[in-house]
Structures are given as structure tokens and as C-alpha cells.
């Protein structure tokens, strides 16, 4: 189904965005900001 494909794409995008956000947060914390 088309909605399943869209959902999978959204999930992938959300996952990458989450990883990027976590990475940025970790960098900020490690710098003591």
C-alpha cells in the first residue's frame, strides 16, 4: 500500500533527524555548554 511506503519514508527521515539531534546534543554536553 502507498501509505505504508510513505510511513516507512517518514520513519526513516524521523530516525535520521533524531540521530542528528542526539549527536548535536551530545556535542553540546561534551563541550560543557
UniProtKB/Swiss-Prot annotation:
Principal location: secreted
Keyword field: Amidation, Amphibian defense peptide, Antibiotic, Antimicrobial, Secreted
GO CC, alphabetical: extracellular region
Residues with PTM Alanine amide: 33
Pfam family membership, one: DD_K
Localisation: Secreted
Spans traversing the lipid bilayer: none
Keyword Secreted: yes
Family, similarity comment: Belongs to the frog skin active peptide (FSAP) family. Dermaseptin subfamily.
Protein name: Dermaseptin DS VIII-like peptide
Organism annotation: Phyllomedusa burmeisteri
